[in-house]
Amino acid sequence: MSQAQYAGTGRRKNAVARVRLVPGTGKITVNKKDVEEYIPHADLRLVINQPFAVTSTVGSYDVFVNVVGGGYAGQSGAIRHGIARALLQVDPDFRDSLKRAGLLTRDSRKVERKKPGLKKARKASQFSKR
C-alpha cells in the first residue's frame, strides 16, 4: 500500500523547485542531499520551513525536492513556494493562513537586463556637462 504524496511546483527568480510531501518525520532532502548539506545558510533554511510554521505542521511531512536554476536564495524561495502549494493539496483550509503570510504569491521580481551603452541595468557612466 503506497502512502499519500502531495506535489507542488515553486518558482523564484530563475529557480524552479518540484516538491513532494510524504507523511513522515520532517526530513528535508534537496537534490538527493540533506538540506543542511545543500543550503549552507541557516537563515535560508528558516525560509524553507516557513510554510510548516504557519500551518503548524512542523515535523509532519518528509520533503523531497528537485530544484534547478538560480542561487541559494532563489532556490530557497522556490522550495518555500512549492511546499506552500503542496500543503494546499494536503488541506485546502490552509489557504487562508498561507495567503495571509504571503507564501502562495509568486514573487515576480527578476534580474533586469543590462542595456547597451550603460555599465549595468541602470548604472550609467558619470555625466560631464562640459
Curated annotation (Swiss-Prot):
Q: Per the record, where are the segments of Basic residues compositional bias?
A: 111-130
User: What Pfam family is a match, any one?
Assistant: Ribosomal_S9
Q: Which Gene3D superfamilies match?
A: 3.30.230.10
Stretches the record annotates as Disordered: 106-130
At the top level of its lineage, which domain of life is listed? Bacteria
Protein family membership: Belongs to the universal ribosomal protein uS9 family.
Q: Which keywords does this chain's UniProt record carry? A: Ribonucleoprotein, Ribosomal protein
Query: What protein does this entry describe?
Result: Small ribosomal subunit protein uS9
* Record GO cellular component, one term: cytosolic small ribosomal subunit
For whether the record's keyword set contains Ribosomal protein, the answer is yes
What Gene Ontology molecular function terms does this protein carry?
RNA binding; structural constituent of ribosome
Gene Ontology BP, a term: translation
InterPro entries attached here? Ribosomal_Su5_D2-typ_SF, Ribosomal_uS9, Ribosomal_uS9_bac/plastid, Ribosomal_uS9_CS, Ribsml_uS5_D2-typ_fold_subgr
The top of its lineage is: Bacteria, Bacillati, Bacillota, Bacilli, Lactobacillales
